[in-house]
Amino acid sequence: MDRLDTSRVHRLLESPVGGLFETAPLETLQLRRLPRQFAVRRARAAADVSLGAGPAAFLREADAPPAPHLHDRIEAALAEFAEIRERHEEVSERWEAAFWGDEETTPNERVALERERRRADAAHARPSSTFGFLASDHFVPPVAFDVPSPDDARERWAHELAEPERLYGFADSTVTESLPRVSRSKTVLGPGTVEYRLRFETPSLHVGDTATARVYEPDGAADDIPTLVFFSGLGSYGDRLSYWPEEEAIGRRLARDGYRAVLPDAPWHGRREPLGQFSGEPYLARMPVSAFELLGAAVQETGVLVDWARTEGAPAVAVGGLSLGGSIAFAVAGRCGEWPEPMRPDLVGTVAAPGSLMQTLSESKLVSLLDLDDALSAAGWTDEDLNEFAPLLDPPAEPDLAPERIFCWYGSHDDVAPTETTATLVRQWDVPRRNVRTWDRGHLGTAARLYRGDEFQRTLTAALDRLAATGRDDDESDATAETTT
């Protein structure tokens, strides 16, 4: 029987050659290329809503200046992209019918269609060869900003500033009786795994779309297996791409080891990308408001997924994340105390996540790379204004999980998710030293270490096993002592 394969890119990343991705010179190069990559995505998002309207309309949608001298080249690029999108839509329609509809399909047919869908999705999501010339010539910005003024934000979010649980909490203790119904797609066979998708209406009042996630389980396993819910970082396309590092390093690796992994699409990411914007762009475009809108929605959706895992029989459930995904996990650890018990995770593990988004907006290298600092200043934001929104942007002073249930990995040279913000938070929360690991890496190097190694995976699954064996009452941890590696 046919199965999806482990990506050759991931095999290379796991090899000795992949160690280059943990090094500072390659990180510098990757970060330098990021604005161009985002500009290509911005151009594609603009093309999605301006096909047929001509080059001038496309440039307006892209938030780019007029460029009559490029109209012929843009016209050709749009014609090429129209074919890419038509193919993407045709394959997506067949995939939807096969995995979510009543159409009868065989396992082999679903594997073939999943491969075809990923190729078409990837070609549509990141058409670098089609729009790269616009990014290279700096005509298209990396982000189309629409930053609200501080006064507008204060007026709109006054109630939440006074009571953050309005954003992060649930209405009452009976919420589990009215949670959105979680639907499950048909399965597809992966490399030693069974994989399927979930979807449900987000409980957030501020996002208002369908939450989605991909699930990885051991082939032939029972339902009562420990589960990890793990969020990817900013800009992730999830399974819209042929290669998704977290899929291989977290989803499939844990499933082959006997665990269930749930990899959600964060709001405005992956399959939740809004028309006319690229994956993750809304999070950047309306800072700082968009940051806590995303966090609030993702935190509530995590509660739904934790509850779903328990209804499936999971004896213990952890929540984790990388970078922005780690910020979501930190927020869950700090905000879940008043939730109904089935929605609260047993453990939280973060990788390369900042301890303060408020400080990150002032100190992160990414902010200047993508011109977010200029956009905030142009809208009138000062450090003092941002500090007013810290109750919504940052984790609270004390966690709602026992500190022994919190694990943290971060890079000692991280200038994207500033190192000191993470170190300060874990000290403030009294996270045991044995639960904290500092890697001698930058931001992308820390992510590469997660993808290439197994320390995060071994630590969390060992903790899940202990809790499953003791009925979730064990607060002791034998995680590796804090070191720098």
Where are these regions (language model features)?
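The feature captures the conserved acid-bearing segment of alpha/beta-hydrolase catalytic domains
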Residues: 358-421
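Alpha/beta-hydrolase active-site loop
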Residues: 277-312
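Short, flexible, mixed-charge acidic loops at enzyme active sites
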Residues: 272-284, 363-367
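Short, surface-exposed "cap/lid" segments of acyl-processing enzymes
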Residues: 205-275
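Short beta-strand segments that buttress and anchor functional surface loops
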Residues: 196-205
